[in-house]
Amino acid sequence: MANTQLQLSPTNTNSRQKFTVSFWLKRGKINSEQCVWTTRLDSGNNTLFKFNANDTFTFKCNKSNADALVLTSNALFRDASGWYNVVIAVDTTQSTDTNRVKIYINGVQETSFGTATYPSQNLSLEINESGNQVWYIGSESSQNYFDGSMSYFAFVSETQEAPTVFGSTDSTTGEWQIKTSITPSVAFGTNGFLILKDGSSLTDQSSNSNNFSL
């Protein structure tokens, strides 16, 4: 997807406190800053997930040019031959700060962070809002493009889901494998979507018709 980005402008506003993002990716290049996705109003108001130049990842939210959420992993992600399933499950209404954002890599929750700034309770993140906000998949709004492949990119817009909604452990090999049928605990939500189900289709498979464009 180098130098390619997918775009969607939400037409509805759903919960900005509860949502889940899941995607499968294979890195085509390491040791470079690459944004996997961002939701962006402007440079000072956005939410994004990216790989850093040292191959850690960062999930962050900027509000009014200030960091409202920053989680940067200690773990390094340098495997360019295998697939990673990343699940980011958010519920800022939780009383315990570490329960407000949970990040899973291949079904295992990441708990070791070099930087860990959790959102304040009940914070509304910069996501899931109609108007001028835009989803970008594969870039940070026309910069820091992701180099690699993606598949089964899903957004559940109103609930914090478990990673088992999107994948399962193979009973023989112990490997985390994709679930080709995704059923959220409640529903995808009005702004929810599932694209790249076949690795290339931008047509939403969730029945919401939230189709992306190049």
Feature names for model-found ranges:
Residues N3-K60, Q94-D97, E161-T164:
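Extracellular glycan-recognition modules
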Residues F23, S81-T92, I103:
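Short tryptophan-centered beta-strand motifs in secreted/extracellular beta-sheet-rich domains
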Residues V21-K29, V86-I88, I137, M150-A154, ...:
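Short hydrophobic/aromatic patches on beta-strands that form ligand-binding or substrate-lining surfaces
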Residues Q7-S9, T38-R40, L48-N52, T58-N62, ...:
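Beta-strand-rich, repetitive solenoid scaffolds
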Residues M1-K18, A68-R78, E140-S142, I178-V186:
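Short surface loop/edge beta-strand patches of beta-sandwich-type extracellular domains
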Residues M1-T4, S95-D97, T111-Y118, S149-L214:
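Extended recognition patches within non-cytosolic domains
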